[in-house]
A protein has these predicted regions:
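Conserved MFS/SLC helix-loop-helix module at the cytosolic interface between two early adjacent transmembrane helices
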Residues: 8-44
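Helix-to-loop junctions at the C-terminal end of transmembrane segments
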Residues: 9-21, 206-218, 302-303
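Paired small-residue
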Residues: 36-39, 47-56, 244-252
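Helix-loop-helix hairpin linking two adjacent transmembrane segments in secondary transporters
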Residues: 48, 77-78, 82-131, 176, ...
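Cytoplasmic helix-loop-helix junction between adjacent transmembrane helices
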Residues: 52-90
């Protein structure tokens, strides 16, 4: 529910707020997140808890989209892809620390404590946004009709297809990562936490490495990260039965997962020069479409009785489709795209 809400509401929320300056909009979006988590922490029933997640979903895509736009705007032309990747690195570090800690905390304390912890962190974030976000003019010449042309750009549509049809394979496996580790590895709660930490650590390193890839080499490097994802996913169930190999493959899975996202984010944002504001939010939204589809595909496969090892094989097949679409993208770029002089 959260992922599809982000995908559907995110672009609409960004269109509504196009004229709001980034240094004002970002604290407002974080405030929405704080309120949603207060509602979640105090929720008397599941319906109210679900409502809190929907509230939180309204700010997800615009928040990361605006952050990436600000980073790309203040960076020099030669450093734009690196700036976008650094924003993604913040998210990756949050995953590295937050997911295992949340899992650990949830195993020993009331789930409402987790919401309270997120509220405290969000308040600190909001204060930081108010203090440090520069007053850059992202929205001075914002034009809704011009921004909507992003949906007519063939290059962007191809990249969107790569994310939707390729990256959903990643989420098909990622959805069941924790239960697979519990069922097939020798680890218990602490070991599971370490595995999730290794996934996040791999994500941070992968993000930082691919964040330095210049614009004209993004497409070629996508083949490498997709290949790494394919291999780690199809071997995941077999490899995690050994403690050392389990930690290694969790690291590689994180490396491939978060090493791919800055490449795709940069491709969408840098390809949408006619619609920079909506494109950055669209990138965050499309990843959540892939998240939603991957979870649905995985759930359907599990419900019909397929074992985890077959689900990971199907995930690998979906990633191969993403690699094929990347080939289509490469052929399109050879004919129609001229990369800037700084690449």
């Amino acid at each position: 529910v959260y992922a599809i809400s982000v995908a559907l509401i995110g672009p609409l929320m960004r269109i509504i707020t196009l004229k709001v300056h980034a240094h004002r909009l970002l604290p407002i979006l974080v405030a929405i997140f704080i309120i949603s988590n207060i509602v979640g922490m105090l929720a008397p029933n599941f319906n109210v808890l679900l409502l809190s997640r929907l509230m939180s979903a309204t700010m997800h895509a615009p928040f990361f989209g605006v952050c990436m736009s600000v980073a790309a705007t203040v960076a020099s032309p030669a450093k734009k892809t690196q700036a976008i990747a650094l924003v993604q690195a913040g998210l990756t570090i949050a995953v590295m620390l937050g997911v295992p800690f949340g899992s650990f905390l949830g195993g020993f304390a009331n789930w409402r404590v987790v919401f309270g912890f997120m509220i405290v962190l969000a308040i600190i974030t909001m204060l930081g946004m108010i203090k440090f976000v520069p007053n850059v003019s992202l929205s001075a010449e914002a034009n809704i009709s011009k921004e909507l042309t992003v949906f007519k750009n063939p290059h962007i549509l191809i990249v969107i297809a790569i994310i939707v049809f390729g990256y959903s394979g990643v989420f098909t496996t990622y959805t069941f990562m924790e239960p697979m580790i519990r069922d097939f590895s020798p680890f218990k709660i602490v070991g599971l936490t370490v595995c999730l930490f290794m996934f996040g650590l791999g994500g941070v390193i992968g993000n930082l490495i691919t964040g330095n890839v210049p614009e004209n080499k993004l497409t070629k490097n996508l083949y490498l990260t997709f290949l790494l994802l394919f291999l780690t996913i199809v071997l995941f169930v077999t490899v995690i039965q050994n403690s050392i190999l389990a930690l290694t493959i969790c690291f590689l899975f994180g490396f491939g997962t978060f090493g791919t996202t800055p490449l795709l984010n940069s491709k969408i944002i840098l390809s949408a020069k006619e619609a920079p504001l909506l494109a950055s939010t669209l990138a965050a939204s499309i990843f959540n479409v892939a998240n939603f589809l991957g979870a649905i595909i995985g759930s359907i496969l599990l419900s019909v009785g397929l074992p985890y090892i077959q689900i990971t094989m199907i995930s690998g097949g979906i990633i191969v489709l993403g690699m094929f679409l990347n080939l289509v993208n490469q052929l399109y770029e050879k004919k129609h795209v001229t990369f800037n002089e700084y690449s």
